Amino acid sequence: MKARRNKKQVPSFRKLIKTSKVKLEYKLKNKQFKQQSTIKKYRKEQRKLRQAVKDAVSKKPFPLEDPKSKRPVKGMEREEEDEEDQALPLDMMDDDDLQLMKDLGQKASFLTRDLSSSEPVHIKKRKHESVIDKYEKMPRTLQTAPEKELIHLLPIKDKSGIIPQTREKPVTDIQQEEEDEEELEVEEEVVENPIQELTIEEHLIVRKKKLQEKKIQIATLASSILSDPESNIKKLKELRSMLMEQDPDVAVTVRKLVIISLMELFKDITPSYKIRPLTEAEKSTKIRKETQKLREFEEGLVSQYKFYLENLEQIVKDWKQRKLKKSNVVSLKAYKGLAEVAVKSLCELLVALPHFNFHNNIIVLIVPLMNDGSKLVSEMCCEAVKKLFKQDKLGQASLGVIKVISGFVKGRNYEVRPEMLKTFLCLRIKEVEVKKDTEDINKPKKFMTFKEKRKTLSRMQRKWKKAEEKLERELREAEASESTERKLKLHTETLNIVFVTYFRILKKAQRSPLLPAVLEGLAKFAHLINVEFFDDLLVVLHTLIESGDLSYQESLHCVQTAFHILSGQGDVLNIDPMKFYTHLYKTLFKLHAGATNDGIEIVLHCLDVMLSKRRKQVSHQRALAFIKRLCTLALQVLPNSSIGLLATTRILMHTFPRTDLLLDNESQGSGVFLPELEEPEYCNAQNTALWELHALRRHYHPVVQRFAVHLLAGAPSEGSEALKPELSRRSAVELFEAYSMAAMTFNPPVEPSNSKKKDKLLQGDSFLNEDLNQLIKRYCNEVTTEIPLDFTKCLKTSVQ
């Protein structure tokens, strides 16, 4: 039979250290309660003992045996026997009998028993002897000191065997109160010193003093660590222990200060490489003192960084679960601010230390918080992820974040915030193509093959060449300078995950609020999509537009995505995008000044891709129709939108020179212009004129006026009607953003009115008419007299 394996695990040292203060307090209370219960038991026994002695002394003891007396049958006979016993004089008893009775009176446990109610005594001698033996066998307790409690220690084993070890448990001396029973039963009341109540001003002064002391302590520890990190790495633990500040007056503030201080310390003292754990061979080898000191610094840094991240994670988790520990001195309301500081620190570490240990753990913590209900927390996390994407040149950290976000979105069944997917727009994928061109020009040095080395180099030279190549390889790894192939591989894997996420949403969650972010992302990365997916993707986009379930902004995103696809690798495809032109032409009139200007920016991007960049595929009739509709739309939108639309009209008039016929009257051509027709090819736009420009010449915004005059003159590049360089060299989107009134400011600023005409001040009499002036003065100077009012005359006249 195999020995039964003990499944109970030995608690680790970390677990033993984590014993809470509440548990220790409960242990101490239980110990004190046991001591008090032991004392009470002892007092109770002593009280019973004294009472039994008093009763025994006051009563006359009965003899052990009485052969004549049997169990009474009648009450009268018993009373007579009692009278005879009481009448027995003490002179008839021997001295030995009296001494025996006194000795028996001292035995409390013996006298407490009711001897009179014992079983009847028989006359026979054997029976009498058995009764005496029975009493002799009964245990007797004397009035002695209580037994001392023993503590069992670990036994000692020697040749003879196991020797148990014990020790007396220390017991406090208790004064025995023997006066009254009532005094023994009354518990001692502990008189507590009354706490002195402080006023609000005094409390604030005390709190300020405590907080100042804690700040000085934090600053001292942080400065000592920064001055010499390798020697003072142990002080990180002391600083981190202040995260458990228990003073309720300054607990929240001190914890926030410690979190921020530790975050800045780790950003400063962390090396620019990842610290790996040592192997057994490395631990066993002898090293120099400097190397040993560096190893101790790295191990201490990694362990304290790990514990710090665990503390931040626990703070955020407790806040999310809305629970606090019983011993916690921080309220739930204040815990929210503490959790926000913890999230901010995690975001800073995510951006600042993407190369260091536990970066993936930080990503796993940050990504779910991007979808948090708190807007502040969600924005902080999304901004941190965007910063990471923008500054990540290699792509390793971006790939890790993309994997976690994709899995989170899928796990939540695509019910997440759109801001999570909008972070994909900050990926640095396009820069690979630029770097590829530069690297093609400056090609890296290729290593020689074995045959080339053998032909050109001697044996010693080959040996040195091999050592040099090995050194170059190690330096490249140390500097983290990855090759172009490595970057392309990482970026390809990242884009695959991004497109898989986008296509899943297009397929399964077409009515999701994530659709605009998906379409915007597809529009940005459309040039990197495989050509094989273009046909299916365009069909899906057209189906979404025709379904009617999308808002005008979402439908504009579909149009923008479709033309981004067709303007890149899609040029080789024979696809007619006329339906997308029609949809954009139809959607333009849904924009107006009563709505937000977000749609205008998308329209400007679409017009640039659809008309300017595809000028060879755009017909003359289509260009005329769009120019006419853009000028009409400029009348009903905000000034910055009008400037962007007029700038686009100027570009189209330069791109399609024959559109200047719209500046003539509408009597030329055949047919009638149909402004409400949804087909731009058949609306007869050549039969109309841009009369809207005359209305825009009187616009209150000076830049709109300038653009209208410039377009009426035929959009010249030179001359008095030409635009200033600050307007002509900027794109339509840049002008739209530059003159935006989102900040509630007018650009250009409104000039103050400085009229040179002075108002004529009337001196003397206010009224120029003398008769009126005299009449007013007379009535003002008259003394009012009370005259009774009589309306009877008026009533009579009215009746008549």
Curated annotation (Swiss-Prot):
Region described as Disordered: spans on this chain: 37-90
Alphabetically ordered keywords of this record: Coiled coil, Isopeptide bond, Nucleus, Ubl conjugation
Basic residues: compositionally biased ranges: 40-51
GO MF entry, a single one: chromatin binding
Localisation: Nucleus, Nucleolus
GO CC terms, sorted: nucleolus
Protein name: Nucleolar complex protein 3 homolog
